Amino acid sequence: YEIMPSLVGSEMCIRDSICTLKNLILKYVYNKPLLDADELFEKCMEYKEKIAPFVCDTHTYIQNALKEGKEILLEGQLGTLKDPDFGIYPMVTSSPTLAGYGCVGAGIPANQIKDIVCVTKAYSSAVGAGEFVSEILDEEEAQQLRIHGGDKGEFGATTGRPRRVGWFDCVATRYGVECQGATQVVMTALDCLSYLEEIKVCVGYELDGEVIDYFPTTPKLKRCKPVFKTFKGWHCDIRGIRDYDKLPQETRDYVEFIESKIGFPITMVSNGPEREAIIHKIK
């Protein structure tokens, strides 16, 4: 994260001065052995064949694609609340996570972005510390959602560490899609809630005795308590259904209530991990 803005990074090309700069840092900052330019060159040549097909003048490549009318898809890794400016600072990442920054990273003019799709699960989850208003604090209840959640449960893919889980948060989600400038929302993992007889949705925050429906700054967020609305669960297996209208009424009520609270159209939902499990709500 630091190398490029510090102006000490290396581009995908050979520069005679690259070792000179790096060696100054190694010698006077880290007191480490210096790099040998010839050895480094040989090592880079080993990697060249693997990465060469993916290196090009991306500006020209993208501009030509736009002129030819091709569709370009940009995918962000993290959500709004991990953004260093608009997220729950300091529990954020080090680079922007908003859709607008996709233009910067890819070199696409901002006026060329026509559709911004925000993806949210049908419940909430989090990794690591930080404010989590709708978190399920009862460990037994949380563990049940972890087991049923995700593709292989809500556990770290590498460490196996249990993730924090909670009910869907309309306040945080509305804030998130507003910051992203969403044109549509996709709700995934509806099937993960099928075991529940009742499902809660966080519809507001209680802050110092007052109920609010906006997402506050981090110091205030620390004092917020969730305000829940309880829904009757569908309590049946909904996997395999491919038509939105054939989902249980309780499932549709859940989706459409959330849609009304966040103020953005939910155009697709999913009821399983497969590609085929994407259901178009709005055709």
Model-inferred region functions:
Residues 200, 210-283:
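Internal helix-turn-beta structural module
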Residues 16, 35, 39, 53-60, ...:
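Conserved active-site and cofactor/substrate-binding residues in soluble primary-metabolism enzymes
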Residues 102-230, 238:
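A glycine- and small/hydrophobic-rich beta-loop-beta segment
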Residues 38-50, 154-159, 231-244:
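Short, basic, glycine/proline-bearing loop/turn elements
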Residues 83-87, 93-94, 127-132, 197-201, ...:
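Short acidic, glycine/serine/threonine-rich loops at helix termini
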Residues 1-9, 14:
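Single conserved hydrophobic/aromatic residue that forms the stacking wall/gate
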Residues 51-56, 73-75, 82-83, 112, ...:
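General beta-strand structural signal in soluble alpha/beta enzymes
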Residues 19-80:
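A charged, amphipathic alpha-helical module
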